[in-house]
Regions:
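Basic, polar low-complexity surface loops/patches
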Residues: 2-131
């Protein structure tokens, strides 16, 4: 197995473990989120979900598109955005880090506009995935 495939497999495994063990707490945190980007360690990448994914998506290169996850254990699609671990260092220079743990980071951001978030969510979940 080459290095790229090995890295991808490791990232996928870490995301799978994260969602298997922490999905409810992640979604609960995102349900009430309005001004923080919650990032979770996934190997070479950090991943954000739902509102955190929206805020992260606004900050990063537009070629990095969010991924819509359809999980058997959750009735609705979940939006995930990722950022390479090296680019998180740039975020540290531009945004206030509220929490730093081994596998979790939280950055403060400007408060999100609910209408803009809903439009973004519909674009990625409904229009592009045709659910």
């Amino acid at each position: 197995m080459n290095t790229t495939r090995s890295t991808q497999a490791n990232t996928f495994a870490r995301i799978n473990t994260l969602l298997t063990t922490n999905l409810k707490s992640i979604l609960k945190k995102e349900d009430h989120n309005a001004d923080r980007i919650n990032l979770y360690d996934a190997g070479e990448y950090w991943v954000a979900f739902e509102k955190s994914a929206y805020m992260l998506d606004k900050m990063i290169d537009k070629s990095d598109k969010p991924i819509v996850l359809h999980l058997k254990v959750h009735p609705f699609p979940i939006v995930m955005q990722s950022i390479h671990y090296q680019r998180v260092n740039d975020m540290c220079k531009k945004h206030i880090m509220a929490k730093k743990q081994l596998e979790y980071l939280q950055f403060l951001t400007q408060r999100i506009d609910p209408a803009s978030y809903n439009k973004w969510y519909r674009e990625f979940v409904v229009e592009k995935n045709l659910i």
